[in-house]
């Protein structure tokens, strides 16, 4: 288990984890996990977030290749965990995931937040539930193991860099419900990437305009 000395904390903000434990329990009293706090901590397998945490920065757990279990302590006002996802409460959005994440199909989760799975290179499969309306900026940025994605008819927006540098991504089904795709959504993806779209849809036009192969279904 982790030791308090392994954490660099300033005024309740967890700046950086400096330990080498495979099971990490963030100390109670931490109110924010700053951007890059656990970046490249490749040995961590599980993380427990205390109920005192009110904010989690972008890329906080990026490139944690061994991370397979994420838990938020019960009683947290801002976040909850389910299916190894951290979910922002209220209008529910997934803000953090790992290679073992299963996005809940409860019907309450409306989006995948900015950089939620960024740097999750070991993620090779993800099911997007039919309640999801948007993919935030960099939602799957750097998910180099992801090979195929099917977006449900509920999705309307794909954010900037949502699938940037997903080097193994070869197919993605995008429904006609999607009305906005960022120009940089697929930057750095394989030349073999095929977007599967409806004929005469916005997505078909997007693929052709951006030099991406398109298959009509």
Give short role names for the model-derived ranges.
Residues 35-37, 58-60, 114-116, 136-141, ...:
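Consensus positions within tandem repeat domains that build extended binding/scaffold surfaces
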Residues 1-13, 18-32, 41-55, 65-111, ...:
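Structural signature of tandem-repeat unit edges
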């Amino acid at each position: 288990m982790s030791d308090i000395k392994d954490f660099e904390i300033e005024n309740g903000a967890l700046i950086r984890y400096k330990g080498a434990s495979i099971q990490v329990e963030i100390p109670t009293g931490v109110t924010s996990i700053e951007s890059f706090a656990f970046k490249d901590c490749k040995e961590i397998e599980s993380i427990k977030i205390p109920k005192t945490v009110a904010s989690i920065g972008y890329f906080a757990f990026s490139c944690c290749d061994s991370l397979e279990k994420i838990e938020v302590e019960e009683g947290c006002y801002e976040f909850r965990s389910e299916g190894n996802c951290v979910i922002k409460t209220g209008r529910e959005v997934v803000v953090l995931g790992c290679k073992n994440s299963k996005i809940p199909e409860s019907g309450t989760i409306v989006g995948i937040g900015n950089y939620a799975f960024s740097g999750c290179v070991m993620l090779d499969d993800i099911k997007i539930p039919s309640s999801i309306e948007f993919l935030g900026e960099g939602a799957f940025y750097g998910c180099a193991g992801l090979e195929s994605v099917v977006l449900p008819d509920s999705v309307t927006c794909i954010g900037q860099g949502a699938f940037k540098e997903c080097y193994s991504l070869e197919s993605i089904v995008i429904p006609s419900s999607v009305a906005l795709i960022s120009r940089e959504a697929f930057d750095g993806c394989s030349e073999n990437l095929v977007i599967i779209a409806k004929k005469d849809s916005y997505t078909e036009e997007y693929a052709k305009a951006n030099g991406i192969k398109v298959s009509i279904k």
